[in-house]
Swiss-Prot record:
<protein>
    <recommendedName>
        <fullName>Active regulator of SIRT1</fullName>
    </recommendedName>
</protein>
<feature type="region of interest" description="Disordered">
    <location>
        <begin position="95"/>
        <end position="123"/>
    </location>
</feature>
<dbReference type="GO" id="GO:0042274">
    <property type="term" value="P:ribosomal small subunit biogenesis"/>
</dbReference>
<feature type="region of interest" description="Disordered">
    <location>
        <begin position="1"/>
        <end position="52"/>
    </location>
</feature>
<dbReference type="GO" id="GO:0032040">
    <property type="term" value="C:small-subunit processome"/>
</dbReference>
<dbReference type="GO" id="GO:0019899">
    <property type="term" value="F:enzyme binding"/>
</dbReference>
<comment type="function">
    <text>Part of the small subunit (SSU) processome, first precursor of the small eukaryotic ribosomal subunit. During the assembly of the SSU processome in the nucleolus, many ribosome biogenesis factors, an RNA chaperone and ribosomal proteins associate with the nascent pre-rRNA and work in concert to generate RNA folding, modifications, rearrangements and cleavage as well as targeted degradation of pre-ribosomal RNA by the RNA exosome. Acts as a chaperone that specifically mediates the integration of RPS19 in state post-A1. Direct regulator of SIRT1.</text>
</comment>
<dbReference type="Pfam" id="PF15684">
    <property type="entry name" value="AROS"/>
</dbReference>
<comment type="similarity">
    <text>Belongs to the AROS family.</text>
</comment>
<dbReference type="InterPro" id="IPR023262">
    <property type="entry name" value="AROS"/>
</dbReference>
<dbReference type="GO" id="GO:0005654">
    <property type="term" value="C:nucleoplasm"/>
</dbReference>
<dbReference type="GO" id="GO:0005730">
    <property type="term" value="C:nucleolus"/>
</dbReference>
<comment type="subunit">
    <text>Part of the small subunit (SSU) processome, composed of more than 70 proteins and the RNA chaperone small nucleolar RNA (snoRNA) U3.</text>
</comment>
<feature type="compositionally biased region" description="Basic and acidic residues">
    <location>
        <begin position="108"/>
        <end position="120"/>
    </location>
</feature>
<keyword id="KW-0539">Nucleus</keyword>
Amino acid sequence: MSASLIRRGLELLEAPGQGKAPPALQQGRDGTRPAGTARRRKVTAGPGKNKATIKGRVVKSAIEEYHKKKAVNHLKANLLYMTSGRCVADKAVTQQVLTQNRGRKSKDRPAEKKEKKKPEGTVFTEEDFRKFEREYFGIP
């Protein structure tokens, strides 16, 4: 890992409200370094503008992103909303909605009653058949 990633991670983990110690209280190393290095270190140490990013881009905090996407429980707000408004619709409106939604699927329709077939009776009587037999077959 690079030093900048570690530094950024430590900045995320430090408690909010706790900043860096003032420069007078920071423990410094021996002062044998050239003046240019100390100046460069002071410039990069502050939480200033990150020069390594694209122009206009803001560096996002991972913790803030996590809190944005964390699941929120809306139960209390929903219960309050549902219980506060006791608006009951008219009977005619509810009946109209029910009739519009009913009967579109075949399973919602009541079964049609089939008519019972009556046994087919003959129009002719037994006497008519005998008469026909005599005429057709010639049986006396």
